[in-house]
Amino acid sequence: MPWKELPVTDPIRLTGLLTGGWDKLAFQPFAEGVEIYPILEGEPALALLKYEPGAAVPRHLHTGLETICVLSGSQSDEHGTYQTGTVIANPEGTSHEVWSDDGCIVLIQWN
């Protein structure tokens, strides 16, 4: 395999995510009661999602891997409720509806 020059870019750093550092970030509307802070666009994409209490994202099909880390609060789907510190991996071909009864912040990666 020939060597390929890749463009040089600086890494993206977000500090304090385990201690509420998202409070200073400018989230944007995503779905009713859910806001997004895009970190990396394209594939894979990376973002923070902020769910207000009672907010939900309708059922959707994953066309690639989706990985979620719950940073604060709890998030639920039909398979269970995931507390702070939980990592959920949803492989390609899976689907679910997601909600948060009490509100949460998640770090999410998807392809």
Model-flagged regions — what are they?
Residues P38-L40, L48-K50, P58-H62, H79-G80, ...:
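Short histidine-centered beta-strand/loop micro-motifs
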Residues E52-A55, H62-D77, T84:
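Glycine- and acidic-residue-biased ligand/ion/polar-headgroup-sensing regions
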